[in-house]
Every structure is written in C-alpha cells, then in structure tokens.
Amino acid sequence: MPPAPPPPMSARVRQLCDDALAHLVPGPGRTMVEQVRAKLSVPLTITVAGGVSSGKSTLVNALLGQRIAAVDAGECTRVVTEFRYGNPERVEVVGTDGVVDVLGLARGRMPEHLGRPTDEISSVVVYLSNALLNHVAVVDTPGLNTVTEVNEETTSNFLGISGREGELTAGAVSRADALVFLLPLLRQSDADALRGFSKLFGGSTLSSASSVAVLSKVDRLAKGGDPMLAAAPIAGRVAAELRGVVSGVIPVIGLLAETAQAAVFTEADALALAAVAAVDDPLDRDDMLLTSDDFLGFDGLDLERSQRARLLSMLDLYGLKVAVRATDGGARTASDFLKVFDEASGFASLREVVVQRFAGQSEVFKAHAAMNDLRRASYLRNDPANLRALRALRSPLEKIELDPALHGLRLLEVAQAVAAGTLALPESLLADVLALTAAPDPRSVVGVVAGRSSEAAAAGAKRWAAWENDPRRSPVESRLARVMKEGYEMMWSEFDEVAR
C-alpha cells in the first residue's frame, strides 16, 4: 500500500499552532499564535491598493462581479473595507473602540453613511454571497498620495503614507497574502520612485509571486487610437523598473471591466447604444464623442439626457467609441456588448492572475505568512511567562522549512528577499526566481519535454551553485542561492527518475 500523501501545508502549520497553544498561557505570545491559527482558517486575503482616484474600488467591483464598493469620494473610500463570504449579506463597521455596528446594504451597495466619523472607524467588513469570496477575501483600501515630489526623502512621503488613511492602507498591505497595486500612468519612469514601491513590503511576506501591478485608466492615453497599444510600452517600462517586486504590470480599463463583469449593463442599454450608433456621419460622431458635455448635449442624438448620463457612467467616452464600433460590426444584444467590453478592458489577464495564480497557490502563500508570524512570535521578549514555549516553536518550524515536499515555502523566501531589495541578483538569476515562484507547477519552467527537461533543470542547479560558491557572496546570499539550487536539483531528480 502506498504511503498516505502529506497533509496540506496549512494543516501542518495549524497543527504546530495547536501544539504550541497547549503549552501557552494567556499573554502576548498566546494571542499572536491564536491569530496565526485563525488566519489559516480563512480564505487568502488579496489587498487592492494604489493612489488616490486610481480606480481601486472600480477594480474591486470588477473582481467581485457586482457593483458594491463605493467609487465616489465619501466615507467608504476613506476606510479599509474587507469583502468576505457570508450570509445574510451585511456590513459590519468595526470602531476604534472595538464596538461593531451592523448595517444593511443599500439596494445591494455600500451604505452612503457608516454611522460614525471615519476617524472612529478601524475597518469595515462586508459579507456577501459571492462565488469569488468562497476562495479569497478582497480588501479595498484608502488611496495613497502618489503625486508627491519624486525626490522626497522617504518612501512613506512618496506613497502618501502620512496620516491616518495612509497608515491604514500600509497596515492592510502588510497583512495581505497577495497584492494588486494600481499605478498611475507614468510616461517617464523614475527608477528611485518606482523602486520605493517595494518599501510597502516591509514587515510583510509579499513577493513578486504574490503581487501584480495594474496600469489603470489607460483609456485616457490615446484619443482616437487604441489605448491598450499605447499602454503596452509604458507597462513594459514600468515592469522592467519593478522587476523582482511584482510579477507583471497589466494595463486595465477599470470602468469597462466593471461594466463587463458587474451585471449592470442591460438590454435597454444595448438599445440606447444602437441609437448612439445611428449617428453615422463620421464628423457628427467625432463631435458627439469629443467630450462628455458634447455627448450629453448633442442635438442629433435621439436619446434622453438621463440615458446618455447612464451610458457615460458605465462606459465613459472611450467605452462609447468601442460600443459604436461594435454596433457597426454587428453587436446588438447586451451579451454581445459585454463580450466586447471585457476584451477591450484588458481585465482577462488580471482575472487569470487573481483566480488562477493567487487563489491556486493560496496554500503556499498562507503557510508562508503563518510561518513568518510564528517565527516572529518565537523571538518575543515581552512575554516572560511564555518564553520557553515560544522558543520551542523554532525547531519544528525549521523541520517544516527543510521538508523537500514544502520547498515552495523556501522559494517564496527568496522572492520576498528580492522584492524587499535585500537580495540583488544578475538578470539571468532574477529570471529564475520570478519563473520558479510564479508558476503553479515549477516543472513547467524548464519545459516538460522528454530528454530536455532534465538538462534544463541541471543547468539551473549549476547556475545557482556557481553563484552560491562565489567568495563575494554574503552568508545570507549563499543560503538563498542554495534554496534555488536545491529547487532545480529536486526537479532534475524527478525528471531523471521518470526517464528511468
């Protein structure tokens, strides 16, 4: 009889928590271990962060597939809001005094007022019967002020982490298992400013494997042309500057993505677009879609002003142009338009990252975060009654880390060091780290091809062995290089065994 498969990563770490709790008395150490255990039992937390008015809440709505998050400046956009699965659907406002107020949704959306001043609110938790939230929790954060001078001395000033809202966002990022970060449209990248983004990772377990950047509102890039084409070189330049910090930079038109995903576009809206497309003279069309005011006031359009305003709120001018071209191409039904909007928004690439990569690797991300928290707990000094029990965590933690079956946890440690700027690598080795930590199955990195996969894995191990043994390497660099080398050696061993 074959041996039973090892328990999931999170189950092993949860058992470690239980073993420790059996010996811990009430105090800071016990509280920390209890919190670690509790977090292992909830879905992966994906935090959405970015600059003020960068489109965070709009993107959250697209991810959730419903228009729930507040997008207008108001109380809800100034607090951390977490979306979790739950029934009945409700809003729980957590005060700084620990009191929780329960509110109902207002026609399926966040209430306009939260019942207390925002400076007295610690966080807001929204429970929804939403399919995505069965697998992940999504956190919407207040905007960071990303328009300060690029030569500010501190990253906190550059990112706007000064004041209560910035501190709340930084705290949410530090607690995240995965991060979606919205960046402004940077036509001229500044390496120092962009690398400053990685400072948000301080104190967290985030890495390029668990982080992606979104170039938002790219529809404002090209008037008359395809903004996604205009955004591609900008995204490439930003991705190069953030290489090792995020897994990629994805251009997205958030409003189109929200309209395509959030079940707000109706057959009546499709008929309204047919009326817009009926203005078929090219010059008249250009005049009608020049500005929002031009569209609202165009005399030759047989459409009520309220209908025009609704279309603008869902599509904006670029979306209207996309819709008109789609109508010319034969689109008639709401379903036709939704497919067009989804494709034009660029959202599919982000959805793949969130649903397939982040949710697919939730076991690894959660276990990695939990083990880092437990390691910190083992060094607590302000809990003398639990000192011995906390120190006892170190040995079993090391055993889990050294288990070949859990090597993915150690690979994440390398990616985390790269993201935090504590490990600088040559380009070829950096590519290895990004590839191994981003792939759900690391073997795909070397290409599972008979006779060649083994050679590629052996070559990878050789590259890292050479770097590890370079006398210029520090002890930390050598240790992390050894982790990468062992990852390739494990793949080589698997391929070699199959070949036999």
Model-predicted segments: where are they?
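Charged, amphipathic alpha-helical linker segments immediately N-terminal to NTP-binding catalytic cores
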Residues: 1-26
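Charge-rich, solvent-exposed alpha-helical interaction surfaces
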Residues: 12, 16-19, 353, 370-373, ...
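C-terminal end of P-loop GTPase domains and the immediately downstream helical coupling element
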Residues: 212, 221-226, 232-403, 407-409
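Short, flexible helix-adjacent loops and helix caps
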Residues: 68, 223, 362-363, 469-476
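N-terminal J-domain/J-like co-chaperone modules of DnaJ/Hsp40 proteins
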Residues: 406-500
